[in-house]
A protein has these predicted regions:
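ATP-dependent carboxylate-amine ligase
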Residues: 2-180
Length: 180
């Protein structure tokens, strides 16, 4: 909106501004819709805090009135363990199906991170979660269960093109997984 105001004040016609904006890509990794040939939508977002996850899930709910929301989410290793149960609670509360998986586990075991996430949920809530440690497998399975009109949100890594495991950054790109 600010860009529109500035360019218009410089004498550029609104029609030309609208035309230019229609071809502009959004911010990579922020509510980024990945164009696929499927009848469901895949969105990638960097949401790696409880607030960010809640905000992007609210956005998904606003644009997706009829289909299911399927959320793939993990939490980073060697980072604030206190947010893990909060992230889990938000994902389960705001999604129809949830997959817990790896993010950047760093020096922690993925299963330990997932267990910290599960600790924030009741037994009934845990029944709505599928835990798949391998992020690629979790993404593929989430897409496999998606149906027409659903939105698959892949949260946590956004624009990142690596996964940090035991001090090594391995090439990993959520978008590449979706497009294969």
């Amino acid at each position: 909106l600010c860009a529109i105001g500035i360019t218009h004040s410089l004498g550029i016609k609104l029609h030309d501004i609208a035309k230019a904006l229609s071809t502009a890509d959004g911010v990579k990794g922020r509510a980024e819709v990945v164009r696929t040939d499927t009848d469901y939508t895949v969105m990638i977002d960097y949401a790696h805090t409880p607030d960010a996850l809640e905000n992007v899930l609210n956005t998904v709910k606003e644009i997706n009135k009829s289909g299911k929301t399927i959320c793939v989410v993990g939490c980073g290793g060697n980072r604030d363990k206190g947010k893990r149960p909060m992230m889990a609670k938000i994902a389960v509360k705001m999604s129809d199906e949830v997959f817990f998986t790896a993010d950047n586990p760093r020096d922690e075991e993925v299963k330990d991170i997932i267990n910290d996430m599960l600790a924030g949920l009741s037994e009934d809530e845990q029944m709505n979660v599928t835990c798949i440690e391998d992020r690629k497998e979790a993404i593929l399975e989430a897409c496999n269960v998606a149906e027409k009109g659903d939105v698959v949100l892949i949260a946590g890594k956004g624009h990142e093109t690596y996964q940090e495991i035991k001090g090594v950054k391995h090439h990993f790109d959520d978008k590449e997984i979706i497009l294969k």
